[in-house]
């Protein structure tokens, strides 16, 4: 493998050597300028950063954790893990300065009651403000709860009407099955009655001229 070509960066030294050996009789026009103000960078092209070569096998599966952020790790985390691994019972000690009696779990219900009290106070204030506004003439549209109840009632009434029709149809089918007479026999009876009624009606007499 050939090395880097450094001849372009040593053009001034080459010209000086040629002048000293009298190989050239006259200095180039740029000789003094390059000697007084040398270039700040080398004239050769820098080599790009060589990436690590692959193992020869094509990568067909995309990495699933390509866009996953890297885990933030601190030196204190490792020290803390080592400490509690060596002293596991230190985890049972209270670590809050204000509550150092070791009975923090008993305060769970007390904290929940405080939360409920605060929410109840906010709800009462909101209700009083609404009543005062309605007293002076303010009008509020239906809330989400009222709209939801109306939609639920409408759906229930629609279902009730549909269920009533289904029950009536089921009862008719059940009655027909118990009597043992189908719909065809009933239609035949109706046709027979209509025919008998037609026979009972006398035809008008024809007048012969």
Curated annotation (Swiss-Prot):
Keyword Ubl conjugation in record: no
GO MF annotation list: structural constituent of ribosome
Listed InterPro entries: Ribosomal_mS23_fun
Protein origin, superkingdom: Eukaryota
Keyword terms of this UniProt record: Mitochondrion, Ribonucleoprotein, Ribosomal protein
Family matches, as Pfam families: MRP-S25 (PF13741)
Primary localisation category: mitochondrion
GO cellular component, as recorded: mitochondrial small ribosomal subunit
Record-linked PANTHER family: 37S RIBOSOMAL PROTEIN S25, MITOCHONDRIAL (PTHR37799), SMALL RIBOSOMAL SUBUNIT PROTEIN MS23 (PTHR37799:SF1)
Similarity-based family: Belongs to the mitochondrion-specific ribosomal protein mS23 family.
Protein name: Small ribosomal subunit protein mS23
Species for this entry: Sclerotinia sclerotiorum (strain ATCC 18683 / 1980 / Ss-1)
Phylogenetic classification of the source organism: Eukaryota, Fungi, Dikarya, Ascomycota, Pezizomycotina
């Amino acid at each position: 493998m050939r090395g880097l070509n450094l001849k372009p960066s040593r053009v001034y030294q080459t010209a000086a050597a040629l002048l000293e050996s009298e190989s050239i009789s006259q200095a180039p026009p740029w000789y003094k300028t390059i000697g007084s103000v040398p270039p700040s960078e080398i004239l050769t092209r820098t080599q790009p950063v060589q990436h690590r070569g692959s193992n020869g096998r094509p990568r067909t599966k995309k990495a699933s954790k390509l866009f996953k952020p890297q885990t933030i790790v601190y030196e204190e985390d490792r020290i803390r893990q080592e400490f509690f691994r060596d002293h596991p019972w230190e985890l049972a000690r209270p670590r809050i300065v204000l509550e150092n009696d070791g009975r923090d779990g008993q305060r769970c219900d007390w904290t929940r009651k405080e939360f409920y009290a605060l929410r109840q106070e906010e709800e009462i204030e909101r209700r009083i403000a609404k009543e005062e506004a309605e007293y002076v003439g303010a009008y509020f549209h239906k809330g989400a709860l009222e709209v939801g109840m109306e939609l639920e009632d409408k759906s229930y009434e629609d279902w009730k009407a549909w269920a009533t029709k289904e029950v009536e149809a089921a009862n008719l089918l059940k009655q027909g099955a118990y009597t043992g007479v189908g719909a065809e026999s009933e239609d035949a009876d109706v046709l027979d009655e209509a025919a008998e009624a037609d026979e009972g009606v006398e035809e008008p007499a024809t007048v012969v001229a």
